[in-house]
C-alpha cells in the first residue's frame, strides 16, 4: 500500500512538473511566465523567455526545440527586455497578446486590439506564433508578418506600393543585443524584382534581377538550379518573396549584425552554411563604381568596360575604384536614327546584370536590340532567359564578371571603339574573298553538280517548314526554335522504323532518333487522324519553346512538310512514368523516396506553369503517361497540345471542345467545359494516388461493388489513414506518416468543388512541411454499377486515350 502511494505521488509530481514547463497555448487564464515554454504541436519550435550569458535581461523568443546551441529565430520584445522574474506573456481582455512586467506595466504588445470574446496564442510547426479567435478560428495576428532578423520556410518578404506596407528582415545590433541593427533585407519594387541588403538607406548587396526560378546575380543559381524560392509580382504594385525547404529539413535565412545574409540547413547533427552574401569584395555594391566591372578572381580586381577609362587614374592606382569609369569616346546618336550607323554594341559575357535596369515587355531578342539601337538614351541591353529584355538608361552600376555563368550584356559604344578602320577591313576582306572565289570556283562547280539535287531538296524541305509556319499556322514568337529538314528526321529515326518506336498516344507516335552529331532525340509524329490540328500544334510549339524549367520537357525544334507535322524533343532515357508504375517488374526500381521525389517534382513543374511562368499555363491533360523521367528519375511534364495561356493570377474559362483524358478530368471540366488552375490540381491528385498505389485509375476495380481508385482511397483514408493504399512493393522503404499525408493531399486535390482544392503554392507547402492539413470531403466519381459481363462507372466512362467531347450551349 505504501509503495502504491509513493508511486501515485511520484506520478502526480511528474505531471505537475510537465504542466509547469510546457504549454499547449497561451490564454488569459494560462499565461506564459519565465521558466515555462510553449511548444509547437510536433515539437519543432519552442517559445519562451531567454537571456544572454546569464544576464538579467529577459526576452521572449522562438527557437528550434532540442537543438544545442540555441538558435533564436524571432524575438518579441527585442527593444525592451524585462528584468524581473514575475514577467509574463498573456492574452488581454480585448484579445491582444501582451508582455507584462512585475508592476503589471505593458512592456510589449502586438499593437492591435480585437472585437473578440476570447482568443489564444499558439505556436505552429512552421515557427509562426499566431493569435487565434476562439469562436471563428480566424488568425488575428501572426509573427510571420512581423520579422526580426530571420526568415523561416513559408514566410515571405513583401511590398505593397498602394498601401506602403513593406515586410523586411532587420539585423540585430550585435549577437547578444537583438534590438534593431544597421542592416535590412528586402525585395525591390522593380520589375523584375531583386533582393537587396540595405545599410541604412544605401544598398550594401543585391542579388540581381529575378528570372523565374533564380537570381541572375548569384552564379550558383544557373538554369539547372533547384530553387527553394518563389517570387510573385502583380500589376497592382505588390510583390512577395517566399522561401521553401524540401524534405522537412530545418533551415532558416538570417541577416547578421555585420550585414551578412546567410542560409543555414540542419543535417541532423549540426548546422551547415549553404549560402552567404556578400562573400568577397565583388559582392559589395558598387565596388568598382559606375561603368566598372569587378572581376571575380583571387583577389578580386576592378577594370573598366571596353570603351571606358578610369575617371581618376591616381585613385585607381591607389586601389580606390569607387569613382568608376568614364566613356573614352562620346556617342553620336543622330546617325543611328537616320539610317547611318555611328554606334554599335560590344558584348560582354558572364556578367551580373547592373542595377537600374528597365524591363521591356513582349519584346524578343531582335526587338530588344532594335529598340536600344534607335533609342539614344539606351546605354546597354541584355536579353535574359527567364526575364526577356532589360535595358539601361543610367550608369552601369554594380557589374560583376563571373568565371562561369552570368548573362551577356551588350554595351553601346562609338563605332570607332569597336575595332579601328572599318573601311580598310572591308577592302582587305573583299580582296581575300575574291581571290578565294576564283581559286575555288571550278571545284565548287563540279561539286555542285553532284550535290545540287540533294541540296535543293533539303532547302525546299526547310523552306516548306518555315512557309507552312508563316502562312498556315499564324506565326508567334518562337525565337530560338530550330526548323529541321524532313530528311534529317528520317535519317535520325531510320525512316520511322518500328525498332525506334517509343510509344503511341492519342495524337500520334513517338520515335527515338539520333542526329549526325550523336545527339539523341525524341520525335513526335502527329497522326492526320489524331484530331490535333493547327491550333494544338502551334500551341505546343509556342508554349514549350518559351517555358524552361527542370521539371518540364524541352523542345528542340519542329518539322512541317506537306501533311507531316513533327515535334523534336530532348530524349529522356527512362521514357514515361507509366512504363515503371504499371509494370510488375519495373515498379520495383522506384521505391518510395523516388516516388516522393517524383510527386514533388511534378508539383514544382505545375507551380511553375501556374505561378512562376510569365505565360501562366493550364495544362489540361496532366496524366502519368505525360510525365517523362530522365536518367536520374527526375520528372518532366510533357505534351502541351491542349494547354491554355492566360494572364493574371487566377483564370477560369470554358470551351465547347472538352479535350483531355477521362479519369484525370475534373468534374466541372468533364460536365460543363469549365477549366481553371484547379482542373490541373484535380489531375495531379489522381496522379498522386496512382503513384502511391501503383494502380492505373482506368483499370482499378475493388470489391464486389467495383469501387474506383478514388472511392477506395476515400474508404482507406477514413478507416486507416490511407496507409493500406501503398503499393506493397515499396512498403519497406516508406515513412508511414509521409504516405498518409500524401493520401490526404491526393484526396484534397480531387475535391468536387474547385474552391476546396489547394493551389500550387498551398500544394508545395503541404508536401514540404508537417503543418496541419484540412480534412477532405468525399470525392465525386465513386459510384460504380456492375453486372456479370461488364464494369462501368455510374457517372462517366474512363478511357486511357485523350478524348474530345463537344458540348451544347
Curated annotation (Swiss-Prot):
Residue ranges that the UniProt entry lists as topological domain Extracellular: 25-425
InterPro entries, per the entry: Bulb-type_lectin_dom, Bulb-type_lectin_dom_sf, Kinase-like_dom_sf, Pan_app, Prot_kinase_dom, Protein_kinase_ATP_BS, S-locus_recpt_kinase_C, S_locus_glycoprot_dom
Sites bearing Phosphoserine, chain numbering: 530, 545, 625, 638, 698, 792
Cross-referenced SMART domains: B_lectin, PAN_AP, S_TKc
Disulfide bonds: 282-294, 288-302, 368-389, 372-378
Active site feature: 621 (proton acceptor)
Glycosylation, residue list: 53, 88, 94, 103, 117, 134, 236, 320, 375
Family matches, as Pfam families: B_lectin, DUF3403, PAN_2, PK_Tyr_Ser-Thr, S_locus_glycop
Domain Bulb-type lectin: 25-144
Ranges of residues in domain EGF-like: 278-314
Localization (cell): Cell membrane
TM stretches of this protein: 426-446
Domain of life: Eukaryota
Stretches for region CaM-binding: 585-602
BP GO terms, sorted: recognition of pollen
Cellular-component GO terms for this entry: plasma membrane
Gene3D superfamilies in alphabetical order: Bulb-type lectin domain, Phosphorylase Kinase, domain 1, Transferase(Phosphotransferase) domain 1
Predominant place of localization: membrane
Matching PANTHER family: ATP BINDING _ PROTEIN KINASE, RECEPTOR-LIKE SERINE/THREONINE-PROTEIN KINASE SD1-8
UniProt record similarity statement: Belongs to the protein kinase superfamily. Ser/Thr protein kinase family.
Protein known as: G-type lectin S-receptor-like serine/threonine-protein kinase At1g61480
Organism of derivation: Arabidopsis thaliana (Mouse-ear cress)
Lineage: Eukaryota, Viridiplantae, Streptophyta, Embryophyta, Tracheophyta
